[in-house]
Every structure is written in structure tokens, then in C-alpha cells.
Amino acid sequence: GPLEFYIRYVARLASQNPLTHLLWKLEKGALIYVRATAAGVFTINDTVGAHDPRLRVMVAAGTGVAPFVSMIRSEVCRNPLADLSKWVVLHGASYPAELGYRQELLALSTTNGLKYWGTVSRPDETREWIGDVGRVESFFEPDRLPDLEQRLGLESGDFTPDSAVVFVCGLTGTIAAALVRLLDRGFIPNARVIREALGVPPDVRPSLFYELYDPTPVIDVGDPSLIESLRARLQTALARR
């Protein structure tokens, strides 16, 4: 299929792996090498499997929406009439213009049942915006989760690993905030080092997967007080299920 880059130039490096900046310096017609087979396991098949019946909640910050667009396009490419009612995209950016693929995703919400909500963190600078406001991880704040559950057709308190699996792509702050807030609902991260720090048995299946832009740790597992607090929150959530 076609190769498509979704990049954004920024004045200050936000990652120690600045691929965007390297691409930005290339002139038109420059050659780059791309392997025939994509690497990585941030896919539906390599996480929960194509037949998992739960909601697939995809949380993206900025250009982090790119892998989710690829997943959704693949589904529609295989079947233009694919039912996307179990697919959910939560996309955050500073300004509406930075919500890439918004029109395409909104169109799929009409034709295929995709659930899509964009949110902007600087609404005061964009008066025409009438959608959700705040960072994308704010959808998981305790006072906002009931609204998200209602939009998803769930009863209050039912947004748990029994009903949904969560995928997050973005910078460390977004992933960390989403992960920590969803511990209170019993979501288990896929990262082995975090699972071990939280005392999650190896046979417990993960329900939150993430793709990180940079090598900054999502959770400081070397902070005893933090880990003790997070472990207690997770155990409380699991005890309620």
C-alpha cells in the first residue's frame, strides 16, 4: 500500500529520537530507505487480536493519531462496509488545525459507525471551536469518565477491561496520565517493567497498550512511594471487579 508520512515541525525538540527533524531537512526528490516489512508490534493482531469483542479505545496526542488511522484504513480497505462501531478515537491537540485526519475520521463516523472525538487544549485562542476542550487524557478524569461512558453506550462505572481495551500513542506525559488514571478502573499496562513494579502476575493479560515517542520512562519504577501508591490504587480497582 501507499507510504504516507504525517509529520509536524516544531521549534524545540520534544523527543530524543527526532525523526521528524531529519525528514524536514530533505529536499524534494531526495532518496530514503524504507524496509519492505514494517517493524513493531503496535497493531491489533499483535495486541488483542482481530476477534476481540471489546471496544478499541485509541488515545492520540498530536501526530500520535497516525498508527490508529493506519489500523482503521486497513480495516476499511479489507471491507469498505466494515462496522467500526467498536472503534473509538480520542484525539487531542493544541489547536483544531492540528487535529490531523479529522475530516476523514468524521466521515467514517457517518458511513461506518466510528466513534471519534477531538479535543483542543487551547480553546481560548480558537473561537470557532465548539467541541471538547482539554488534553486528550482528560477524558479519563474521574468527573469526565461518566460522560465518556454515556457516549460509548456504557453504564456508569462500566468502562473497565471487561468492556474496552485502550491504546495510547504520544509523548510520555499523555501516556503516563492515561495509564495512571485508568489504573483506577483496573486497566493493566503491557509494559513488563511497570507490570512487575505493580505486582501484576505474568498470566494477567494487559488491557492498555502504548507506543512511546521518546525513551523517557512512562512511570518512574524506582520511586518507592509512587509505586506503592499506584499499586494500592490498582489493587483497589481489581478488588471491585
Model-assigned labels for residue ranges:
Residues 1-57, 121-122, 204-219, 234:
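FAD-binding FR-type
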Residues 21, 32, 76-78, 84, ...:
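C-terminal region/appendage detector
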Residues 49-52, 81, 158-160, 202:
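Short, flexible hinge/linker loops that cap or flank conserved catalytic cores
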Residues 55-57, 88, 165:
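Structural motif
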Residues 58-61, 168-169:
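Active-site-adjacent beta-strand anchor residues
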Residues 61-67:
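Ser/Thr-glycine-rich phosphate-binding loops at phosphate-binding pockets of nucleotides
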Residues 67-80:
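Histidine-anchored nucleotide/phosphate-binding helix
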Residues 90, 95-241:
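Reductase modules of NAD(P)H-dependent flavoproteins
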